[in-house]
């Protein structure tokens, strides 16, 4: 990431350089998803979902990744979904289904801004692709809250974070040590929580990534075998033609 200049004794105007957090790519054929996806889902549900939506992910996407079908179905049924109209032309609420998408915490953008002092919490479905640096940026943002430097006055409804463009953000520090109680007993440090939710959001941005890698591996394998066969067939067919003498009488 390109180094950016900051004026003396001032915060970065476009955001500081994030410390690096790398997601290990899955080699083809892909390995089973790590348990951190499930832990990241827990962090999202208990910490992030009250303000941020995940509108492009359905409950069925979780099946076989970090939950089994019964667990995902139970999570969906725990939510009430507005549906309709019914035979009488009225909307109604029903328990969620696997085909339903994660619900938004707010009915519209105006309600979201009103509840957050004018700031609009972005949907997190594609946040890893929508921000330069992806996991690096999100991890640095989540763990980078600190007191403003000397000479900079604090603000009432904003918080200092050098990794956010402009250095002031309307979201308070969302994760703290012990913020969740992990199901698998992993110590819930702020760094661990940030890492897990980054892994989950990276998966959410491309839930079909492993399938695409596997398909690419199969296609490349098939093309390699086909290329070898065509090379052998060409040698076999043209071997007699290349060595044949044409005599004119």
Predicted features and spans:
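Gly/Gly-Pro-rich "capping" loops immediately C-terminal to redox-active cysteine motifs
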Residues: 53-134, 156-184
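The canonical Cys-X-X-Cys-His
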Residues: 44-55, 197, 201
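Juxtamembrane/start-of-transmembrane alpha-helix segments at the extracytoplasmic/lumenal side
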Residues: 205-222
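Extended, hydrophilic extramembrane loops/domains of integral membrane proteins
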Residues: 171, 175-206, 210
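N-terminal mitochondrial targeting presequence
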Residues: 1-21
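Hydrophobic alpha-helical transmembrane segments and adjacent short intramembrane/lumenal linkers
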Residues: 140-171, 187-191
